[in-house]
Amino acid sequence: MANLNQIQKEVSEILSDQKSMKSDIKAILELLGSQNPTKESLEAVAAKIVNDLTKLINDCPCNKEILEALGNQPKEQLIEQPKEKGKGLNLGKYTYPNYGVGNEELGSSGNPKALTWPFKAPAGWPNQF
């Protein structure tokens, strides 16, 4: 793994390359501005820019590491078959009464303080409905 100093060094190199390419592009544009641009000259400039960028990408050490890692992979991926499927979590069955929910008048809970719907706001609460 690269440490922060190596990463900072590579980033600063890329930044300087980018700045030099920016000045190259400005020089090319000035040259094109002084001439009458033709399709061939524009294609040549575009090809040069693409070639320069491709060279920078291919020369990147991280790109080489990725290609080496991909080259070292086996032709077929080996997937381990799962062993026996274990039983799921042993959760207890749902039990009644479920205190704290339901409507008391429907008999769904034995809790006299169960929540009811529609919700009855306690005294002092603003009326929402």
From Swiss-Prot:
InterPro entries linked to this entry: Caulimo_virion-assoc (IPR004986)
Keywords from the UniProt entry: Coiled coil, Disulfide bond, Host cell junction, Virion
Gene Ontology molecular function, alphabetical: DNA binding
Subcellular location: Virion; Host cell junction, Host plasmodesma
Residues in coiled coil: 1-31, 38-59
Chain spans, region Capsid binding: 122-129
Superkingdom of source: Viruses
GO CC terms in record: host cell plasmodesma; virion component
Similarity comment text for this entry: Belongs to the caulimovirus ORF III family.
Biological function: Plays a role in virus cell-to-cell and plant-to-plant transmission. Interacts with virion icosahedral capsid and movement protein, thereby facilitating virion cell-to-cell transmission through plasmodesmata opened by viral movement protein. Also interacts with aphid transmission factor, attaching the virion to aphid stylet when the animal feeds on an virus infected plant. Aphid saliva may later detach the virion, inducing release of infectious particles when the animal feeds on a new plant.
The name this protein goes by in its record: Virion-associated protein
Source lineage: Viruses, Riboviria, Pararnavirae, Artverviricota, Revtraviricetes
